[in-house]
């Protein structure tokens, strides 16, 4: 199962962690994993390479973590909308492919120094 945890700060999604496998097909032929991977990369690249919003991004074996560095900044306003769109996209995939994606939202406090 793919596990997607979104981070909420001050009524907005400010980050996410995605890990796991959908198990909806053989390795390399799992359309759900492909859809989620593509959406994760599009979201991360849009935030960092096109919106230039500061974000901590960690990509590891079977896991991606992205957290906005300053969620209150003007540059992060659009990035929060992109994360919200990604959340909605995963909800749609999860509804179509039941039992393949678990989505949770965790409340977080402001980062230290804020």
Locate each region found by the language model:
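Short, conserved glycine- and acidic-residue-centered signature motifs
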Residues: 32-36
